[in-house]
Design a protein with these regions (language model features):
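Cytochrome P450 heme-thiolate monooxygenase catalytic domain
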Residues: 1-29, 70-81, 101, 105, ...
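Conserved cytochrome P450 catalytic core segment spanning the I/J/K helices
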Residues: 1-61, 94, 99, 165-168
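Cytochrome P450 heme-binding "Cys pocket" and the immediately downstream C-terminal segment
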Residues: 72-74, 140, 194-231
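C-terminal helix/juxtamembrane-tail motif
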Residues: 145, 213, 229-243
């Protein structure tokens, strides 16, 4: 794939394409040795793009569908919002930004079942947090799942599906501790595909709920397991009927 991209762009002026792969190939072929990456780095990043762009979104959609299937009241609220904005037409980019109820449902599902359960970061400069000294180059694990399920932040109902906790935004939901909600990370190294993922999920849910009502199959066995991302060990069985 990399060789095909290089061959396709041969003869172009300063360009291997404007997508992620093109930018990586450009850095790989850079004349600046300080910024150049190796072929192994390039391949590793391509793997990251695949996992982050496919597995995590699939996982997120799976748990959102489960939450909607087991909470019919919220499913109806989201469906009514979709029909009010789009009717039976395809979702528009302008419209999906106004799906407030759906956004609440998505965020609450991501809180309960974040696709990525933890983040790894390397400390670039030694720092001190209270009495804790964190030296330079130490690898720090940020436990997203633990933060998402901390009752001191979210309250005693932390294990319940309550999308209305996000009714006034993440800051209000986390008691002004927005770093406690990390489905896509945070800061300069957060997920570059965050907005794309949100839009992809909203469009998919809109087109499903416009047409179908979802209920949980009695064959479903709840058993979340970590395989790249959190997913149902035995799959998700649902019943779908036309609205």
């Amino acid at each position: 794939m990399i060789k095909k991209r290089e061959a396709a762009m041969a003869g172009e002026i300063d360009g291997y394409g404007s997508d992620f792969l093109g930018q990586l190939v450009k850095v790989y072929r850079s004349a600046d040795m300080t910024s150049r990456i190796t072929i192994d780095d390039l391949i590793d990043e391509c793997k990251n793009f695949y996992i982050a762009g496919h597995e995590t979104t699939t996982s997120a959609l799976t748990w959102i569908v489960l939450m909607l299937a087991t909470h019919a009241d919220w499913q109806e609220k989201v469906r009514n919002e979709i029909l009010e904005l789009f009717g039976q037409q395809n979702p528009s980019l302008e419209g999906i930004s106004r799906l407030k109820t759906m956004s609440m449902v998505i965020n609450e599902s991501l809180r309960l079942y974040p696709p990525v359960v933890g983040l790894l970061r390397e400390v670039k400069k030694g720092t001190k947090m209270g009495n804790l000294i964190i030296p330079e180059k130490m690898e720090v694990h940020v436990p997203s799942l633990a933060l998402h399920h901390d009752p001191q932040i979210w309250g005693d109902d932390v294990h319940l599906f309550k999308p209305d906790r996000f009714a006034e935004g993440v800051a209000k939901a986390t008691k002004n501790n927005i770093s406690a909600f990390l489905p896509f990370g945070m800061g300069p190294r957060n997920c570059v595909g965050m907005n794309f993922a949100y839009n992809e999920i909203k469009i998919t849910l809109s087109m499903i709920l416009q047409r179908y009502r979802i209920t949980l199959s009695p064959n479903y066995v709840h058993s979340p397991v970590l395989v790249l991302a959190i997913c149902p060990q035995h799959g998700l069985q649902v019943t779908i009927k036309a609205v």
